[in-house]
Amino acid sequence: MERNHWNEKSSGAKRSRERDLTLSTIRSILAADERLRIKASSYLGVGRGVDDEAVIDIFPTGQTMSFLRLLHGFLGTCRGQSMHQVLRDPCVLRKQLLYGVCKTLFDTITVRRVAEEWKLHAALFPYRALDEEDLEQYLLVWSASLRQSVQTGVLGALRDILYQYADNDDYGLYVDWCVTVGLVPLLDVKTKPSEAAERAQFVRAAVQRATETHPLAQDLLQANLALLLQVAERLGAVRIANAPEVRVFKKVRSERLEAQLRGKHIRLYVAAEPLAYERDKLLFTTPVAHLHEEILRYDGLCRHQKICQLLNTFPVKVVTASRHELNCKKLVEMMEQHDRGSDAKKSIMKFLLNVSDSKSRIGIEDSVESFLQDLTPSLVDQNRLLPARGPGGPGVVGPGGAVVGGPAGHVGLLPPPPGPAAPERDIRDLFKKQVIKCLEEQIQSQVDEIQDLRTLNQTWENRVRELRDLLTRYASRREDSMSLGARDAELYHLPVLEAVRKARDAAPFRPLAVEDNRLVANSFFSQFVPGTESLERFLTQLWENEYFRTFRLRRLVTHQGAEEAIVYSNYTVERVTLPYLCHILALGTLDPVPEAYLQLSFGEIVAAAYDDSKFCRYVELICSREKARRRQMSREAAGGVPERGTASSGGPGTLERSAPRRLITADEERRGPERVGRFRNGGPDDPRRAGGPYGFH
């Protein structure tokens, strides 16, 4: 009942309008948020999850891609790497499926069905003798023929089905993901109705073809047709993702591992979860992750060996190194040049400046005198050159032409002057010679300086060229590392001439003159190729130890100790094959195959599954029952039946009344005993005792 307010409007109507307005507002907010989310996700790309959560990429990355490359021989191939091929053998899965299906088929048989088969055989080929050896041979022939018929029919049908639907590399891809990343991306394949009908038709046709002449095998397979269809359907319903668009990542906040294929989420099976102890980085615990660093080191040595083999083919190779140009000899030469007293350029420039500043004859004479004294002070006789300006003032000519004068009483013998113009000519000639000498020295010094600068320029040019080559080489190495070594791997597959050309481009050798500023560091007069045998043996041991200890593979050896084969063990089946069978194919009801059966052929595996099944036990039961019944009938036929009323040894007048027994007529003896009754004291023989493969000896 609604209450009316003074404005004649009910409170319920008011609340209804407010509720509608609130709901409308909420819807508008949600719609706007959805549009914003869609627009934001279109800009974020695949690097984010649906909820914009930060992720750590696991695959593909440079590290995980190198895992796959080195696993299949593209990096660091050695003898021990073949251990992986043993583990990824697809025949293991086919033999596991064959054994599991056969064991299930043979265990579904009933003892009544085996007894009916025996009755049919006994009615067609009745046994008429009472000899135990003949009876045992008769039963042996029946059991062996029944066994062969069933095994042939089952083997033919299952072989066609397995090679049709299990003849792919999914198991190998599963093993590759397990030993490299530890995570297996799974792609569920949607089956169309037409494909399901075609698969069912193929299975029925395979059963019909294989069991046309084996009725019991046909009945057995027809009764278990649902199991065969399930195996074929599961083999085609799941695929291991094998495409460049596969992406595996881990969400940081929720710590969930997810996989995507072309932007769509797919299933992910976790075989070995990576460790997340470092921020924004995962540590892998797989066998290949443990071997990764050693494989890269070995691969680098192999590439170095290949480059040396391609390049070190010339008769002589010289490696030079730069040495410092300021050695001892150079230092001494520079010191001597610096300590030299006279400088021709400075002297002639000083002379020209003095002459230009002179205003009189006396100033010019002083300039000439200073110039000559600076150049050749010991070769010029100042008294003869300028008698009036000698160092001792005006001299006194003594007898015989001796001139006495000077501060220390210098006495010199001078020849008589040839004439008034002789001193002037001597000064001119000497001045001209000195000027020419100064110019020659100046020119020579300029030439020497030019030569030194040229040598220094050549040295720096060589240095710049070396630095440029180093930069080019480092840039090429960076490009090679970004391209994951694809170009380096081509050296092993290219023709010789093409490989030599690429190697020379990568590490060019050029002729170089050994100058004064370079010295010879090393030289090669023959081909040098480093050895990799020791490192290869070490890496092989690492491969074997890692796989043997992780998966517990079994090594088969001959009597001489030589290795014959490396096979799966029971632990390997439980570690590798059963997870694929249970978690991926969803066929966990199949029994695991024993390790001893993995070395057998398909026919031998079917025979082994027959021996381990109830089918074989029921056949043994029927044979034991027939032998016991025949023994009982033989004892009854061998013993006589006394007449009634015959006196016995118990005493006079006493009669022994025996149980009434029917005598066997000649016709019954000719036709053989009736197939009635059960055995009393018989027991099944051991089918595994020595003497034959099937028992009944």
From Swiss-Prot:
Superkingdom of the source species: Viruses
Compositional bias (Basic and acidic residues): 664-689
Gene Ontology cellular component list: host cell nucleus; viral capsid
Keyword list, A-Z: Coiled coil, Host nucleus, Viral genome packaging, Viral release from host cell, Virion
Alphabetized InterPro entries for the sequence: Herpes_Portal
Subcellular location: Virion; Host nucleus
Chief location category: virion
Pfam assignment, any one: Herpes_UL6
One Gene Ontology term from the biological process aspect of the record: chromosome organization
Region of interest called Disordered, as start-end residue ranges on this chain: 633-697
Subunit structure: Homododecamerizes. Interacts with terminase subunits TRM1 and TRM3.
Family: Belongs to the herpesviridae portal protein family.
Protein task: Forms a portal in the viral capsid through which viral DNA is translocated during DNA packaging. Assembles as a dodecamer at a single fivefold axe of the T=16 icosahedric capsid. Binds to the molecular motor that translocates the viral DNA, termed terminase.
Name this polypeptide is given: Portal protein
The species this protein was found in: Human cytomegalovirus (strain Merlin)
